[in-house]
């Protein structure tokens, strides 16, 4: 896929043909250990994208009356798409194991995006965020070992390192320092808009998952850890969401989101190794092409403009679903001490006082992310971990 403008000739599956049964929605899940980890990465990513598709369409429906019917019809299909995707996670994934998988998505997909993003500032923002999710993975891996005696690498399958990143205890910034500069809609490449919509969707899902699953733990440290990292995920949604131009009309945002869904499904279909799941990605790609066609028609009717104005321009290669280990290591070595001051990135020594004060109060009665990982160091070769105090 070099661009999306040619795709406008592909009508996809008509909306009235996009049908499901309960049985296929709650179908056979993947294997936790036998399927490739990137099959699960794609599943989690696409569930986040579909739930965000519901979210954005609900938002549009609340501010305009003429689209409520069409949006409701598309949302129903996307609800069923999200169900069929999300129900692929098997019941033998514990909530903590699923959490580890969510963080693998955040690391590997964000790292892939950071390397193909043409806007230097936006790419910097993705690198900044991935180092925080990288540390979240380390803290949750320690919790998985502590509570369940399990090796997180059973989920990660060796694709993603388990070492500290930028310390979670230092992620808690004043809200003023989580806002970012937006792309300019008239100047930004389509892929820049797609990236911002995609990563915002993925982080929103992670935030919601932690908010829902965190209170269900009996262990007080686990409850605190989920509370702490869920707060950081809200910061990430703020950060990535602010990358999009607020001057875009709701129709422009709808078009971008549909384009992002097409791009993401095409990426999944191209690289999926499980034939059954690949067929699902291909089916849903056709569904999204149908949704994109509907959005284009409403765009033409409401804004009296050609959708190619929004959907034109080249796209880089598909999202690369592969280990980004070397890139992440390079970013970790170069940028672990980076902080934010307003919308700009600065050295740790220049972090503004309002973030330091904000963090000091939050951390004043104990820091779960530090406690859970005290003495923890992941080591290969079994469920028993080597012990080394992490400062």
What are these regions (language model features)?
Residues 1-391:
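Non-heme di-metal
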């Amino acid at each position: 896929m070099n661009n999306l403008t040619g795709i406008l000739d592909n009508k996809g599956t008509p909306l009235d043909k996009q049908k499901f049964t309960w049985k296929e929605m709650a179908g056979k899940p993947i294997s936790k250990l036998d399927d490739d980890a990137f099959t699960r990465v794609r599943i989690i990513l696409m569930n986040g994208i579909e739930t965000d598709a519901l979210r954005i369409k609900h938002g549009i429906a609340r501010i305009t009356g003429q689209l409520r019917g069409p949006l409701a019809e598309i949302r129903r299909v996307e609800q069923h798409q999200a169900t069929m995707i999300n129900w692929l996670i098997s019941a033998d994934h514990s909530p903590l194991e699923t959490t580890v998988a969510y963080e693998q998505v955040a690391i590997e997909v964000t790292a892939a995006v950071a390397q193909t993003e043409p806007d230097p500032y936006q790419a910097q923002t993705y690198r900044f965020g991935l180092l925080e999710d990288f540390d979240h993975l380390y803290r949750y891996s320690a919790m998985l070992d502590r509570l369940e005696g399990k090796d997180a690498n059973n989920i990660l399958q060796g694709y993603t390192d388990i070492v500290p990143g930028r310390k979670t205890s230092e992620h808690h910034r004043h809200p003023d320092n989580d806002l970012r500069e937006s792309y300019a809609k008239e100047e930004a490449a389509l892929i820049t808009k797609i990236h911002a919509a995609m990563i915002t969707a993925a982080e929103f899902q992670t935030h919601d998952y932690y908010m829902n699953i965190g209170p269900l733990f009996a262990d007080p440290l686990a409850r605190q850890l989920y509370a702490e990292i869920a707060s950081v995920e809200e910061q990430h949604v703020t950060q990535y969401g602010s990358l999009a131009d607020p001057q875009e009309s709701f129709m422009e945002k709808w078009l971008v989101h549909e384009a992002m869904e097409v791009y993401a499904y095409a990426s999944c279909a191209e690289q999926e190794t499980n034939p059954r799941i690949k067929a699902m990605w291909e089916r849903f790609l056709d569904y999204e092409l149908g949704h994109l066609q509907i959005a284009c028609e409403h765009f033409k009717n409401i804004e009296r403009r050609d959708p190619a104005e929004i959907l034109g321009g080249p796209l880089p290669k598909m999202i690369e679903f592969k280990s980004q280990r070397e890139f992440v290591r390079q970013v970790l070595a170069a940028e672990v001490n980076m902080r934010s001051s307003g919308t700009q990135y600065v050295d740790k020594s220049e972090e503004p006082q309002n973030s330091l004060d904000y963090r000091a109060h939050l951390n004043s009665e104990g820091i779960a992310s530090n406690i859970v990982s005290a003495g923890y160091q992941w080591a290969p070769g079994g469920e028993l971990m080597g012990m080394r105090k992490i400062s």
